[in-house]
Regions:
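Bacterial N-terminal signal peptides that target proteins for export
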Residues: 1-11
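Bacterial N-terminal signal peptides
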Residues: 9-19
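Conserved nucleotide-cofactor-binding alpha/beta core module
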Residues: 104-221
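Compositionally biased, intrinsically disordered low-complexity segments enriched
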Residues: 4-5, 94, 123, 136
Length: 238
């Protein structure tokens, strides 16, 4: 009888261990991703001069690996953009952080993003602003980004399929507008939808592109060039 009890206890213990293995693996995997995210912030973002503590915390919080295709997950926290299909990319982490810092978000802003892509930039913005409206011209990307953001609990992001050159006039004015693809020239429609005191951050240009920051004060636009960049071109609607 005692041997039988020992045998049953042994079997039970083995089952417990086996049941714990997947959970342990998941925990190890998540911990590893968290460590990679921390290294990304420290070595790629802080080291290059991004210092806004809210932006840094948002970059630590958003799980970038959940916004890239499965075969690129291992590269999610590396220092370069990644393809997401349909000729589009998820931007380099540093560029995401830099552009977000340039927006000077305090938490009460209504933001317009042109080019949802994977939804990663929108997720970062959602932690720093009141509402984020995002336009994506590639419908499959808009659908997958909407599903991913909902799944991860980013409830203040609103995605629409449409032409980014036209903006979203029914939701204007916006405190901040961000473009994640490069037009040859910043569309006047977007400048018109920028509210008084607002900020627009975007790449601009064809082959040679510059990251620019526009501010609107007393109805006048001031433009500042930040650095040279390389983004996918901004696509016109049909």
């Amino acid at each position: 009888m005692q041997q039988k009890n020992i045998f049953l206890i042994t079997i039970f213990s083995m089952l417990c261990v086996l049941n714990c293995i997947p959970a342990a693996c998941r925990m190890k995997g998540e911990t590893s991703m968290e460590q990679l995210r921390e290294l990304m912030v420290k070595n790629q973002i802080e080291a290059r001069g991004v210092s806004d503590t809210r932006v840094l915390e948002a970059m630590r919080s958003v799980e970038r690996h959940k916004f890239v295709p499965g075969h690129h997950i291992a590269s999610a926290y590396e220092d370069h953009p990644l393809p997401i299909g349909h000729g589009q990319t998820i931007s380099q982490p540093y560029i995401v952080a830099l552009m977000t810092e340039l927006c000077e978000l305090k938490g009460k802003e209504k933001v317009l993003e042109i080019g949802t892509g994977s939804g990663y930039q929108a997720a970062v913005l959602s932690l720093l602003a009141r509402e984020v409206y995002s336009i994506e011209i590639v419908e499959p990307l808009a659908i997958s980004a909407s599903e991913k953001l909902a799944e991860l609990g980013y409830t203040n992001v609103h995605i629409r399929v449409g032409d980014g050159y036209k903006g979203m006039p029914d939701k204007a004015p916006f405190d901040v507008i961000m473009l994640t693809a490069s037009p040859p020239k910043i569309p006047q429609a977007l400048i018109d939808q920028l509210g008084e005191g607002g900020i627009l951050v975007a790449p601009e240009g064809d082959y040679s592109q510059e990251l620019v920051k526009l501010t609107k004060q007393n109805g006048k636009i001031t433009k500042r060039t930040i650095t040279y960049v390389r983004f996918v071109p901004m696509i016109h609607g049909s």
